[in-house]
């Protein structure tokens, strides 16, 4: 099973529409981790699970979402309310509180993934519009196979970035 994860599109709806069309038949879920800068109900966000980022001014967006997908409990947030620029510790506490096994977040515009000592998988898909730390605009595909999660990072054109992708054995 595959899950599309995108973040920080900052008003650029064409990219998230293109990704939605590309992956609609391949994924069980599509997630936007905030800072879409679109209105709640915008057609570009249709089919996405989405949260509010620090640049989203529509108060109807949820700050966070907890949901079960493909047998895993996900906690989805933008990250600005959890100080993710400095540490993942607050997210770790929230994961424990929510019983989450996978945390998806954005905000930093830095792409990355890691399996914490707490057994929680942390994934930041980077920014589809304004990357930091590298020039590549990115998004993630999570491919779930039993107890293995493959975090596949793709550039804006859809090319797999093997050096940023990783597989994690979940407990």
Regions found by a protein language model. Give the residues of each.
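Helix-adjacent hinge/juxtasegments
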Residues: 51-54, 60-103
């Amino acid at each position: 099973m595959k899950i599309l994860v995108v973040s920080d599109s900052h008003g650029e709806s064409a990219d998230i529409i293109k990704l939605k069309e590309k992956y609609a038949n391949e994924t069980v879920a599509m997630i936007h981790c905030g800072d879409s800068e679109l209105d709640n109900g915008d057609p570009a966000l249709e089919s996405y699970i989405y949260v509010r980022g620090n640049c989203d001014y529509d108060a109807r967006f949820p700050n966070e979402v907890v949901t079960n997908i493909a047998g895993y409990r996900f906690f989805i947030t933008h990250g600005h309310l959890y100080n993710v620029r400095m540490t993942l510790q607050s997210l770790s506490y929230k994961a424990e509180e929510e019983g989450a096994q996978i945390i998806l977040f954005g905000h930093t515009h830095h792409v990355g993934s890691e399996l914490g000592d707490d057994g929680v998988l942390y994934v930041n898909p980077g920014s589809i519009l304004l990357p930091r730390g590298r020039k590549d605009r990115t998004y993630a595909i999570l491919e779930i196979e039993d107890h293995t999660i493959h975090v596949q990072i793709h550039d804006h054109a859809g090319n797999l970035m093997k050096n940023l992708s990783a597989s994690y054995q979940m407990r």
